[in-house]
Amino acid sequence: MTAQTDSWADATIASLQAKGHRNSGARRAVVELLGRQDCCLTAQEIFDQLRAEGRRVGIASVYRVLEQLSKDGFVQRIDIGAGTTRFEPIHAGGEHHHHLVCDDCGKVEAFADDQLERALQKVEGRTGYSVAGHDVVLRGACRDCAPAR
């Protein structure tokens, strides 16, 4: 783990405790796993990875923890279509990125683009909206699946 992921997990646990939430094994397991990720995961993927690590966490607990983390602003919910929601940590001052989703194999990749960010900021200026945040999900076929189309 990097210092940033360690500090995110530690800060998240400390903040939740300060709000009166118990430091349950499920909560700690989900937070630690999310802190190690480069991109977003579904609740099922989180559950599967925790079980593979030998953590005894129920799927309902994973959903409850993710809901609380989302409500408290520690994770971002990302709707990638087809009724699938993914979750990833929100790092204070960290890298902002968007997502590419392959409609064929389901692969999700993160990407950042300074020109896209500038274009989105211009929209804020033109419309007069005070934009609190945004997420861009681009759908299509990944490098592996595109040749088969």
Question: What is each PLM-predicted segment?
Answer:
Residues 8-20:
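Short, Lys/Arg-enriched N-terminal segment that forms or immediately precedes the first helix
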Residues 9, 26-27:
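Short, leucine-enriched amphipathic alpha-helices that occur as contiguous helical runs
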Residues 25, 36-42:
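Short capping segments at the starts of secondary-structure elements
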Residues 28-33:
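Pre-recognition alpha-helix immediately N-terminal to the DNA-recognition helix
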Residues 45-51, 62:
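A short acidic, leucine-rich amphipathic alpha-helix
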